[in-house]
Amino acid sequence: MGTRLLALAPWLLLLLLQLAGASHVVHRSLEAEQAPSSVPASIVSPLLRTGYHFQPPMNWINDPNGPLYYKGWYHLFYQYNPKGAVWGNIVWAHSVSQDLINWIALEPAIKPDIPSDQYGCWSGSATILPDGTPAILYTGIDRPNINYQVQNIAFPKNASDPLLREWVKPAYNPVATPEPGMNATQFRDPTTAWYADGHWRMLVGGLKGARLGLAYLYRSRDFKTWVRAKHPLHSALTGMWECPDFFPLQAPGLQAGLDTSVPSSKYVLKNSLDLTRYDYYTVGIYNKVTERYVPDNPAGDYHRLRYDYGNFYASKTFFDPVKHRRILLGWANESDSVTYDKAKGWAGIHAIPRKVWLDPSGKQLLQWPIEELETLRGKSVSVFDKVVKPGEHFQVTGLGTYQADVEVSLEVSGLEKAEALDPAFGDDAERLCGAKGADVRGGVVFGLWVLASAGLEEKTAVFFRVFKPAGHGAKPVVLMCTDPTKSSLSPDLYKPTFAGFVDTDISSGKISLRSLIDRSVVESFGAGGKTCILSRVYPSMAIGDKAHLYVFNNGEADIKISHLKAWEMKKPLMNGA
C-alpha cells in the first residue's frame, strides 16, 4: 500500500492544486442550464455524459493539439471555448496525465494575446527539440472577419516545470505567412517537425484553387526562420487538407513506433478532409532527395483509407518515448443539435487514445485502445461456446453495460448462405450499410446490440455482414457497420449509419469485435483493429441500468460466441468533472 501511495503522490498533489483553483477550470456548475421545453429530459441527463472518454467539465471542445510527453507527464492541448458549448473564443486548453486515461486540467496554455493570433489560436503540433525543450507550432488568425491565417511558435516559459504551465511567444512571430497566390484563409494546422540533413521540416495544410488539397512543405535551419519549398510534399484533387500528419512506420507487423525524425522506408500521410469531415490516410514512400511523398497505391488519395469510418476528425498522432509507440488521438463531435448542446452545457469528446502500427500486409494501419484503458475494468462476465440461431438474440447479463468494454470472438457457419454483393454499391460501404442495415434479415449478418432498451425499442447495432467472394479464388467480402437509426426515440438527432470494409479473410468463419460503450458513445474495433467506427448516440430509454447488451443473429446460418468477456468500466479522473 505504501508503494501505491507514493506512486499516487504526484497525482494527489496536482489534484489538490486543481481543486484549490477550481474556479479557473470549471467555469460554471456541472448542472445544465434550464433546458427549453423542446429539449427532452434525457438529453440533459448526466447519464448521457461520457464516463471515461476525454472531455472538459463544460463547454465546447474540438481538435486535439500538440500531444507530447515531458518530464514524467503526458500533455494534451485541445481547441476549447471557455465561454460556451458552441465553437468560438478558441484557446488551447491544457490537461496532463501520467497514463493517458486519468487527466487533470491546467490553465489554458495558449490564448489570443499577440498581433498574429489576436483573433484566434487554432490547431497545431508540438516538436521536441534536440535539447529536450518542447516547441509548439500553431495557426493564428491575425485579421478580423476573414480568417487570415499565419503560423506561430511558442516555447515554455520555464523548461524546468514538468507541467509546462506557462508558454511564451517570441517577438519574431509569425514564422510563416501566406505568400502571393496562396489562399490565406485555407492555410493552417502545422505538423510536428522532423529533422534531417541540417534542416527542420514541417507541413501546413492548404487549398489551391477550388479542389487541390495540399501539404505545404517548409524548411528551417534554426526553427525560427521558415522557408516554403517550391513544391508541396504531396497534393490531390480532394479539397482542403486540414490537420495534416506525417510520420514514419516500423516494418509491417512491428507494433513499436518511431520518433518523427527517425528515417524509415514507410510513412503515413494523413489529412482531415474539410469537405467530408473524415480523416484519410495513405501509406507510402518519402523521397528525401526530391522531398516528395508517393503513396504505395497510385489511386490511394481517392480510395480513401480512413483511421475511423465513423464520427472521428482532426486527429493527431505523437510518439510516446516511454513505451515506444505511436498514439493516435481524435475528436468526436456531438450528433444532436446546437439547442441540445446549449442545454447540456457541453459539446464534444475525444476518442480513447489508440496505438497505431503497420499491418503485416503493409497495406494499412492497425489500431487498438492503449493498454492503460484496461486499468478501468471492473466487474466482468464471460460467455463461452454459446450458439445463437438465425433470427435469435442472446442477452449478456450480470453487469452494467452502459459504461463497458466488450470483447467477443465469433464463429459463423454456413458462409455459403452469404448474399452476392451488388456491384452497384462499388466501394461505398456507408451506402451499402444504409441499404442493408442491421434489421435487414438474410444472408450472413451478426453482431452486438448495445445501449438497448429491454423491449428493443432503442438499440445501437455494431455488426458484420458477409458477402460472397467477387470472383473465383477471392475471399468473402466483410462489411462492418454501426447502425444507430434505432438508437433513440428522441427527436432532432443525427443518426447516420457508418461503415467500412474489413480487409480480413473470414473463410475460416472466425472474426473478432471489441466495443467501448460509454453512455453516449460507441467506439468499435473490428478484426483486431483493421476497421474502426466511433458513433455518438443519445438513448432516451436505454440509459444507466436500463441499458442492455445483446449478441444478435439476423442471418440464415448459426453463429457461435466462442468467447465473450465484458467489463464494467470505472470512471477515471477527468479534468475535475
Curated annotation (Swiss-Prot):
Output the InterPro entries linked to this UniProt entry. Answer: ConA-like_dom_sf, Fructan_Metab_Enzymes, Glyco_hydro_32, Glyco_hydro_32_AS, Glyco_hydro_32_C, Glyco_hydro_32_N, Glyco_hydro_beta-prop_sf
Q: Which SUPFAM superfamilies match?
A: Arabinanase/levansucrase/invertase, Concanavalin A-like lectins/glucanases
State the UniProt keywords alphabetically: Apoplast, Cell wall, Glycoprotein, Glycosidase, Hydrolase, Secreted, Signal
Record's signal peptide: 1-22
Q: Which GO terms describe its molecular function?
A: beta-fructofuranosidase activity
**Compartment(s) where it occurs, according to its Swiss-Prot or TrEMBL record:** Secreted, Extracellular space, Apoplast; Secreted, Cell wall
Its induction note reads: By sugar in excised leaves. By rice blast fungus (M.grisea) 4 hours after infection.
Q: What class of enzyme is it?
A: hydrolase
Q: Where is carbohydrate linked to this protein?
A: N158, N183, N333
Annotated catalysed reactions? Hydrolysis of terminal non-reducing beta-D-fructofuranoside residues in beta-D-fructofuranosides
One GO process term, biological-process aspect: carbohydrate metabolic process
Q: Which CDD domains match?
A: GH32_Fruct1-like
Give the EC number(s) listed in the UniProt record: 3.2.1.26
- Xref: Pfam families: Glyco_hydro_32C, Glyco_hydro_32N
A GO cellular component term found in this entry reads: apoplast
- Free-text tissue specificity from the UniProt record: Expressed in roots, leaves and flowers. Weakly expressed in seeds.
Q: What is its main location?
A: secreted
Kindly give the Gene3D superfamilies that the UniProt entry links to this protein: Exo-inulinase, domain 1 (2.60.120.560), Glycosyl hydrolase domain, family 43 (2.115.10.20)
**PROSITE patterns membership:** GLYCOSYL_HYDROL_F32
**Catalytic residues in the record:** D63
- UniProt family annotation: Belongs to the glycosyl hydrolase 32 family.
Give the PANTHER family listed for this entry: BETA-FRUCTOFURANOSIDASE, INSOLUBLE ISOENZYME CWINV1-RELATED
Give the protein's biological function. Answer: May play a role in sucrose partitioning during seed development and in stress response.
The name this protein carries in UniProt is: Beta-fructofuranosidase, insoluble isoenzyme 1
What gene makes this protein? CIN1
